[in-house]
């Protein structure tokens, strides 16, 4: 009898272990501090919630690389996938197959088309982030007829193109004399980004500002201005404080923005855990995230989408941050 009970206990233990939820957290690519920080937040939340979180991504930002990872995670039996998409539609076939197999699919940082996921963990609406970019630049640019360049990762990435579209609309409305002289891309490559930034500065010797809403492009733009001794150019955009700290301390960058990407990773895993344990989240529902607070599910329309469906929506981060010399040492990510 004791032997049977022991065997039963072992069997139940194995079944319990097999039933533990596994969540895949996928960046656009590995080796970039921004994404690593998001992954750290995701893994930290996994430990708090008792779920297994795996952080992995392609070495280059490509649809094929992300699709391969998605398919691998599905085949390995992962229960949820959270991905920062390199393309709004390129991942959709793989993600829809995953959902058909019962896998919960969420996006973070950069969205797919909304029908290809359930919830998007969004750092801010395009209007919020596009407006922030222009506001940071306008506080430094004094010339009414300023010349401005946009510089970010690629012409196809969802999030950054939405922000830039809104930023350009705000410039047209509020700073009609500004001239957007060029829009160029670094393709998430540090070397190419530096070369591109230097090329912009050389091509436009009277440039007043570079707006770089990308974790590789912003430090590259700052480094390029130092290399070419172009002190009069305002450099603004989005990146992590640990990457930008030296440029802020040297005065090359006066202000840049971001959101707490560690917090974003935590929120994403908490939302995925809710979907796995408690079921779908609909617009108007809330998720209580330990240490952050209660976050509401918003309609897809806050991102400019027309698609709405049951179990589908957007969770916005509670705030965005502008980093300056005065506050940057309060942050470590």
Swiss-Prot record:
Coiled coil: none annotated. GO terms for cellular component: ATP-binding cassette (ABC) transporter complex; outer membrane-bounded periplasmic space. InterPro entries: Bact_Solute-Bind_Prot2, LsrB, Peripla_BP_I, SBP_2_dom. It comes from the Bacteria. SUPFAM superfamilies: Periplasmic binding protein-like I. It is found in: Periplasm. The keyword Magnesium does not apply. Keywords: Periplasm, Signal. The keyword Manganese does not apply. Pfam families: Peripla_BP_4. Disulfide bonds: none annotated. Gene3D superfamilies: 3.40.50.2300. One of its GO terms (molecular function) is carbohydrate binding. Its main location: periplasm. Residues 1-19 form the signal peptide. Belongs to the bacterial solute-binding protein 2 family. Part of the ABC transporter complex LsrABCD involved in autoinducer 2 (AI-2) import. Binds AI-2 and delivers it to the LsrC and LsrD permeases. This is Autoinducer 2-binding protein LsrB. The lineage of its organism: Bacteria, Pseudomonadati, Pseudomonadota, Gammaproteobacteria, Enterobacterales. The gene is lsrB.
């Amino acid at each position: 009898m004791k032997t049977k009970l022991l065997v039963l206990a072992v069997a139940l233990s194995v079944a319990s272990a097999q039933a533990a939820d596994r969540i895949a957290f996928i960046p656009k690519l590995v080796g970039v501090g921004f994404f690593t920080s998001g992954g750290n937040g995701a893994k930290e939340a996994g430990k708090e919630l008792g779920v297994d979180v795996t952080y992995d991504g392609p070495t280059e930002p490509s649809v094929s690389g992300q699709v391969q990872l998605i398919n691998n995670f599905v085949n390995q039996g992962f229960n949820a996938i959270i991905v920062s998409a390199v393309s709004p539609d390129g991942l959709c076939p793989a993600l829809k197959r995953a959902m058909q197999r019962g896998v919960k699919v969420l996006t973070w940082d950069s969205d797919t088309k909304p029908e290809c996921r359930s919830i998007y963990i969004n750092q801010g609406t395009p209007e919020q982030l596009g407006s922030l970019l222009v506001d940071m630049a306008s506080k430094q640019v004094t010339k009414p007829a300023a010349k401005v360049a946009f510089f970010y990762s690629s012409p196809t990435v969802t999030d950054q193109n939405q922000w830039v579209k809104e930023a350009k609309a705000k410039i047209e409305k509020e700073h009609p004399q500004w001239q957007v002289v060029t829009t160029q891309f670094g393709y998430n490559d540090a070397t190419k980004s530096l070369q591109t930034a230097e090329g912009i500065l050389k091509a436009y010797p009277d440039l007043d500002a570079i707006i770089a809403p990308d974790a590789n492009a912003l430090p590259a733009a700052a480094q390029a201005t130092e290399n070419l001794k172009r002190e009069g150019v305002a450099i603004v955009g989005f990146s992590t404080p640990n990457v930008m700290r030296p440029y802020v301390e040297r005065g090359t960058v006066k202000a840049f923005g971001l959101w707490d990407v560690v917090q974003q990773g935590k929120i994403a895993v908490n939302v995925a855990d809710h979907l796995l344990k408690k079921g779908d989240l609909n617009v108007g529902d809330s998720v209580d995230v330990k240490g952050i607070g209660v976050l509401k599910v918003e309609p897809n329309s806050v991102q400019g989408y027309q698609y709405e469906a049951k179990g589908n929506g957007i969770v916005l981060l509670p705030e965005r941050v502008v980093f300056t010399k005065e506050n940057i040492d309060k942050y470590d990510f």
